């Protein structure tokens, strides 16, 4: 069983997270919007309201221990790029970006 983090829990991210759970993996779901985290909290291993553009937050959540991270941040390309840079900085090796 692999451990994944899904950052951005809108339509795409939530679908990816639930599919990974159905495949038997552990999933940490992360979003800055409370409503998205609440919508998926019962379906994933852990759901966290957090700012994924903050490198310290990603480090505190031990995201580097995940087998892979899916970045599914919606329309905000700057936030998506910043998140990926921080993930690389903390040592995440497998990053999949929408």
Indicate where each model-derived feature is located.
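Cytosolic regulatory regions of ion transport systems
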Residues: 1-98
